[in-house]
A protein has these predicted regions:
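Catalytic core of pol beta-like nucleotidyltransferases
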Residues: 2-25, 29-108, 118-206
């Protein structure tokens, strides 16, 4: 079967975006836009030409295996172990791991992304302040899509003998955790509780 011109362009854009994500720590949306401009120039990128995040994620995995195969697994393990520590600390807020540290594509520039499910975002802020955590407040898109946003608290986690790691806490209402919540694309949200993350770590060590 021959690939169509559109499929070839889509694959080329996905590969370029994956390189930006793996090498520079770009997020998927900006990497996709920059890659499309890089490949298409001034031509308008029609929707069917742009790869979806799943295709880009596959390319990130391939890139990591090819160029960072000797360092990426240890980096991923380190971030997952740190994620467990943070999740233990924030257990009262129902933390779930998401993003690159969960799906296995995390690299040198990746941060830890957690979703918290609680009745009050202010309680999370107060908890962090009482722990002397210096955090910044921003907004992230709700995983259900649309125009909804959620408060996100970001901070640097100090590391003995190495650079601090970035942690981002997207604070959802506790009701968002109930039922079969799906994203705007209809796919079930990818997230893992602390027990699931611990199992991933055991699998990596075995």
């Amino acid at each position: 079967m021959h690939l169509t011109d559109i499929e070839l362009l889509r694959a080329e854009i996905a590969a370029a975006a994956a390189r930006m994500i793996a090498e520079d720590g770009a997020d998927y949306a900006s990497a996709k836009r920059k890659a499309a401009r890089q490949i298409l120039g001034d031509a308008k990128a029609r929707g069917e030409i742009l790869p979806d995040n799943a295709q880009i994620e596959d390319e990130v995995r391939a890139y990591n295996e090819l160029f960072f195969g000797d360092t990426q697994p240890a980096r991923l393990l380190h971030l997952r172990q740190l994620a467990v520590q943070v999740m233990e600390e924030l257990a009262r807020f129902n933390p779930y791991l998401t993003g690159a540290v969960l799906n296995g594509t995390a690299g040198e520039h990746s941060d830890i992304h957690l979703q918290l499910f609680t009745s009050s975002a202010k309680d999370v802020e107060i908890y962090l302040l009482n722990k002397n955590v210096n955090f910044e407040v921003s907004e992230s898109n709700h995983f259900k899509g649309g125009q909804a946003v959620v408060e996100t608290l970001s901070f640097l986690l100090p590391q003995k003998g190495r650079a601090p790691e970035g942690v981002h806490l997207a604070v959802y209402d506790v009701d968002d955790l109930r039922g079969g919540v799906r994203t705007a694309s209809g796919k079930r949200t990818e997230r893992a509780d602390i027990d699931a993350v611990r199992r991933l770590i055991v699998e990596e060590d075995s």
